Structures are given as C-alpha cells and as structure tokens.
Amino acid sequence: MKQIPMTIRGAEQLKQELDFLKNTRRPEIINAIAEAREHGDLKENAEYHAAREQQGFCEGRIQEIEGKLANSQIIDVTKIPNNGKVIFGATILLLNIDTEEEVSYQIVGDDEANIKAGLISVNSPIARGLIGKEVDDVVVIQTPGGKVEFEILEVEYK
C-alpha cells in the first residue's frame, strides 16, 4: 500500500476520532444493542437493527482510520528548511490576478482538506499546479470553474 502524506495536525485529528470511536461510541452502541435485545424478538426490533447498523459503520470507520494511520507518512513542515518552494504542508499566499483578491491555502493530505478553512488536498488541481513553484511565480491553474491565474506572494512552512 502506498504512503499517505499527512500533517502532524491531521494525524492528531484522526487519532482523536479513533479514540472517540473506540472509547466512547463503541461502548454506547454495545449498550444500545444490549438494551434492544432485552425488548424481545430481534426480527422485528427496529432499535436492534439500527444499533447493529451503527455498529457496522463505527467498526468500518475504525478500520479505515487505523489503515490510514498505519500507512501515513507524517510530515512536520516546520523541520524542513524553507527554500521558498511550494511543498506538501506549505502555507501559500496567492494573488488571484483576475480579481486582485488574496487567498491563503495550506497543502494538506486528502483527509485534512477543508476549503473553507483554507486547507487544500495535495491532490487538488490548485495544489498540483503550485507544487514546486516559488515566490513571484505566476501559475495558471485549471479549476472546475475555468482557468485561474495566481501569483505566489509568500510561502511559509508553519
């Protein structure tokens, strides 16, 4: 299996979710199943079937997170010397040349991506267009809305 790049923050978020699922959610579901069993006939017991379905989702998510963490390559960008190039984990300040609007993005792993928080996936069109570029470079990126031209104003490793 290939390594999944992930920031330290992303790995911590997954570990917290895993801890919640294993130590809080799993026991809640087990209790709900036990309680539903006490109501008698399991064939027509909607509470029992709903709890079993929740258990399946919970166990599936636990396995998914454990797999991602086992195959993750956790990258601490603060320990990488800043040579001004856009790399995984870098925070980039961009100027949209058409609108004169400044936007800031951090390139993160797929699971961490949240465009509203300025976190873009390393596999997104914007990130793929920026990787390897430097401050003052102008890049044209093909987005779902058409071509967008950005100037790289700043690259930080934080």
UniProtKB/Swiss-Prot annotation:
Biological processes annotated in GO: DNA-templated transcription elongation; regulation of DNA-templated transcription elongation
One function term, GO molecular function aspect: RNA polymerase binding
Classification via InterPro entries: GreA/GreB_C_sf, TF_GreA/GreB_CS, Tscrpt_elong_fac_GreA, Tscrpt_elong_fac_GreA/B, Tscrpt_elong_fac_GreA/B_C, Tscrpt_elong_fac_GreA/B_fam, Tscrpt_elong_fac_GreA/B_N, Tscrpt_elong_fac_GreA/B_N_sf
Transcription found in the keyword field: yes
Tree of life domain: Bacteria
Pfam families the UniProt entry points to: GreA_GreB (PF01272), GreA_GreB_N (PF03449)
UniProt KW keywords: DNA-binding, Transcription, Transcription regulation
Disulphide-bridged cysteine pairs: none
HAMAP family attached to this UniProt entry: GreA_GreB (MF_00105)
Membership in a protein family: Belongs to the GreA/GreB family.
PANTHER family named in the record: TRANSCRIPTION ELONGATION FACTOR GREA
Annotated function: Necessary for efficient RNA polymerase transcription elongation past template-encoded arresting sites. The arresting sites in DNA have the property of trapping a certain fraction of elongating RNA polymerases that pass through, resulting in locked ternary complexes. Cleavage of the nascent transcript by cleavage factors such as GreA or GreB allows the resumption of elongation from the new 3'terminus. GreA releases sequences of 2 to 3 nucleotides.
The protein, known as: Transcription elongation factor GreA
The species this protein was found in: Pasteurella multocida (strain Pm70)
Gene designation: greA
